């Protein structure tokens, strides 16, 4: 017997609508579960306004790369933040790669990750909170991208405090502030170059960096907190010619010119008032020590005079030039 088409009554239509709704809910759940198992198994996270914050890590460690997006309910949501303490005390973590989608790294995110040796920070990060790499003592080098404006926020432990294996820090051109305690007890750090953008450095930022020998500033002298270089007895601060607000000491350390420029004028060589001399030109107010010896085969250099290049120029004359068959000169800055 052939059956004709079934006519839906209002009751049947309600049943069909309910079934469609349930199907949509089931489909959403399936899409959520469709997020790659390897990714879901490694991270816990929250969502807010279409963006994801990584809040924890449950993976096996080793080399970890954060995803830049996650598919949630059929939507690709960007990973924009790493929450506070998200990877704290994860002893199995060896390296971490942070994608360009991440804009901020929360307090203590990698606190006490004692086997962390390599960090790649994406070009989207603008701020790094306090304590992020606290006591990551196997971390040896780090590059801070140009996008970062602040290293720490003066709310807790320093960003790199007690990273005792850290030997090299490369700061991007966007960094304006370095918070207190930022590099405290980085005992292997031997030098650091600060970009022109740096305008403030917090208290004790480089305290107990016992291997530190040179701190190089490309810009003007920044404002500082107290005891910036406490315990850094072998360090010297260097600043570039033409920058401002520098005096003979900075943060308790001697401050001297970095890459000073000096030259002599061949046309000025000659005898004046029975003394041989020449004009020295170079960086304004640079102090120059003129040394002399009598031969280059076995040179014994002795200071003859100390000149200050007031206005960028000074004339040197040798009162002893007639006492030797030959007098050879060199210049140095104290």
Give the ranges of each region predicted by the language model.
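Bacterial N-terminal signal peptides that target proteins for export
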Residues: 2-27
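Basic phosphate/pyrophosphate-binding loop/patch that engages nucleotide-derived ligands
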Residues: 231
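Consensus positions within tandem repeat domains that build extended binding/scaffold surfaces
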Residues: 84-86, 106-111, 129-134, 156-161, ...
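Structural signature of tandem-repeat unit edges
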Residues: 47-49, 61-81, 91-104, 113-127, ...
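Short, composition-biased motifs enriched in small/polar/acidic residues
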Residues: 21-24, 28-31, 35-56, 217-220, ...
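Short, intrinsically disordered, low-complexity terminal segments
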Residues: 15, 31-38, 83, 91, ...
């Amino acid at each position: 017997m052939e059956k004709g088409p079934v006519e839906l009554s209002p009751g049947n239509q309600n049943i069909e609508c309910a079934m469609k709704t349930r199907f949509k809910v089931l489909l959403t759940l399936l899409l959520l579960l469709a997020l790659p198992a390897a990714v879901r198994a490694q991270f816990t996270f929250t969502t807010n306004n279409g963006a994801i914050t990584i809040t924890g890590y449950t993976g096996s460690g080793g080399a970890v790369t954060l995803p830049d997006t996650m598919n949630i309910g059929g939507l690709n949501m960007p990973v924009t933040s790493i929450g506070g303490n998200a990877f704290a005390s994860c002893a199995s973590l060896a390296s971490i790669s942070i994608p360009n989608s991440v804009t901020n790294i929360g307090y203590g995110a990698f606190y006490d990750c004692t086997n962390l040796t390599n960090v790649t920070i994406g070009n989207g990060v603008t701020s790094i909170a306090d304590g992020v790499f606290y006591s990551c003592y196997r971390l040896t080098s780090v590059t801070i991208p140009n996008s970062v404006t602040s290293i720490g926020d003066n709310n807790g432990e320093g960003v790199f405090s007690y990273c005792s294996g850290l030997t090299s820090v490369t700061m991007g051109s966007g960094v304006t502030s370095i918070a207190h305690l930022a590099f405290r007890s980085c005992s292997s750090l031997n030098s650091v170059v600060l970009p022109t953008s740096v305008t403030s450095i917090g208290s004790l930022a480089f305290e107990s960096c016992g291997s530190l020998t040179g701190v190089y500033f490309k810009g003007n002298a920044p404002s500082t907190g107290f005891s910036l270089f406490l315990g850094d007895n072998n360090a010297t601060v260097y600043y570039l010619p033409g920058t401002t607000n520098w005096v003979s000491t900075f943060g308790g350390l001697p401050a001297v010119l970095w890459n000073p420029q000096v030259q002599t004028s061949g046309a000025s060589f000659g005898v004046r008032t029975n003394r041989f001399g020449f004009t020295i030109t170079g960086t304004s107010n640079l102090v120059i020590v003129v040394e002399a010896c009598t031969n280059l085969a076995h040179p014994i250099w002795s200071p003859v005079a100390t000149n200050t290049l007031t206005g960028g120029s000074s004339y040197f004359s040798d009162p002893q030039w007639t006492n030797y068959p030959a007098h050879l000169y060199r210049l140095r800055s104290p």
